[in-house]
């Protein structure tokens, strides 16, 4: 079946306008971005093929330029467009967190942290510095490590928190293995940071561990 033979309400753009973006499948959303198919495949068929070939929509989005462009129907122009869309999405999430509002949505915070850390190949330790009303003052990647570990120094965290005049912190780091379950080392360093920051009356509100498509909150586990 070609797109021309589909009823209007089944066309991705028309379906989005009538029912909203949530009603569309991953392939239909990607089809709107791609706009055209290739010889022998309409744009929806091409989108479905690409998602299956890459393994998921996320893996397609995180592919390198070389990996992306070697697929039929894709090229450098589409790669540039996609990177621009992803960067705008990340900036939107960052702006939402930094616009001066208090952090009241753990899910939104988790979504932003995941967008920053999820696809990094090396472990990185990320901090949101907050004021006494839990508004974001500053965010930083403070430490980066090897593929499986980052050296986190409590003295440096305290120093940066005092520099930003922070009243509270939210911590996050990624597991490049993709497994979000916190290790005993993760729990130990979190406890050391809680104790060190407590000496200067700065609280840790949460520590998120970001994996592949999942994340774990220390606060939700009752560990903070």
Curated annotation (Swiss-Prot):
Zn(2+) binds at residues 173, 175, 186. A motif (JAMM motif) lies at residues 173-186. Pfam families: RadC, UPF0758_N. Residues 102-224 form the MPN domain. PROSITE patterns: MPN, UPF0758. GO terms for molecular function: metal ion binding; metallopeptidase activity. InterPro entries: MPN, RadC_JAB, RuvA_2-like, UPF0758, UPF0758_CS, UPF0758_N. The keyword Transport does not apply. One of its GO terms (biological process) is proteolysis. Keywords: Hydrolase, Metal-binding, Metalloprotease, Protease, Zinc. Belongs to the UPF0758 family. This is UPF0758 protein VIBHAR_00653. It comes from Vibrio campbellii (strain ATCC BAA-1116). The lineage of its organism: Bacteria, Pseudomonadati, Pseudomonadota, Gammaproteobacteria, Vibrionales.
């Amino acid at each position: 079946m070609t797109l021309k033979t589909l009823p209007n309400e089944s066309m991705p753009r028309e379906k989005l306008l009538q029912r909203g973006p949530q009603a569309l499948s991953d392939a239909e959303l990607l089809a709107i971005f791609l706009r055209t198919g290739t010889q022998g495949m309409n744009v929806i068929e091409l989108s479905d093929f690409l998602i299956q070939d890459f393994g998921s929509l996320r893996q397609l989005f995180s592919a390198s330029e070389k990996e992306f462009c070697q697929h039929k129907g894709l090229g450098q122009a589409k790669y540039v467009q996609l990177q621009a869309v992803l960067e705008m999405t990340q900036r939107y999430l960052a702006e939402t967190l930094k616009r001066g509002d208090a952090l009241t949505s753990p899910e939104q915070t988790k979504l932003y942290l995941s967008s920053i850390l999820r696809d990094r190949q090396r472990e990185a330790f990320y901090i949101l510095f907050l004021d006494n009303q839990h508004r974001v003052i500053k965010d930083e990647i403070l430490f980066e490590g090897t593929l499986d570990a980052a050296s986190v120094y409590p003295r440096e965290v305290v120093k940066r928190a005092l520099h930003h005049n922070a009243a509270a912190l939210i911590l996050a780091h990624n597991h490049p293995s993709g497994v979000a379950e916190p290790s005993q080392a993760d729990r130990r360093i979190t406890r050391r940071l809680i104790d060190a920051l407590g000496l200067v009356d700065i609280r840790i509100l949460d520590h998120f561990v970001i994996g592949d498509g999942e994340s774990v909150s220390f606060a939700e586990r009752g560990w903070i």
